[in-house]
Amino acid sequence: MKVEYYKEYSPCLERDMEYKVYGHAGTPILVFPSQNGRFFDFENNGMVATVEDLIDNGNIQLFCCDSIDLETWSEEGGHDVGSRSHMLEQYYHYIVDELVPRIIDINAMCGTHAKGIYTTGCSLGASHAANFLFRRPDIFSGCIALSGYYDSDLFFHEYVDDNVYRNSPIKYIEGMSYDHPYVEMYRKCRIVL
């Protein structure tokens, strides 16, 4: 199995971010680590081995990213809530504006162009996976979210600002009109929650 490690500077997060890529071709799947996890956890917990045949056959290509959960969702002590919510949105922009273009470029090296990126994760990783698909169904075409929690109240309690709202699928989907263009896009996505 082809495995590549990347460490690249993120202007959005003002730090180096790490990720690993497993496979040479196939549907790109963006893997979010579970709560407070790291990019290597999916492999270390045996999850890469469970789909090794799909990777080796070129059916899927995994992109295991890092999280900043300790500064956002899980950080309830040191940082003020406004800083935490700001970093939620910075992480969103890191994924969408910086990592997704890299995923597209790396995946295209096999000579084909994916028709969308899937997301997956467990625990808080599932929450990220679902949030990114629901926020950007124009980029993400499927999601497998295992044991996620899709509201911000568990981590932010009663606090809600624009950033928290935009990262809480329960809140923004409930507030979405039935004729919003994303509703039709959701119907075309493969979603497992």
Identify the residue ranges that each predicted region occupies.
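Non-catalytic cap/lid and distal C-terminal segments of serine-dependent acyl enzymes
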Residues: 1-193
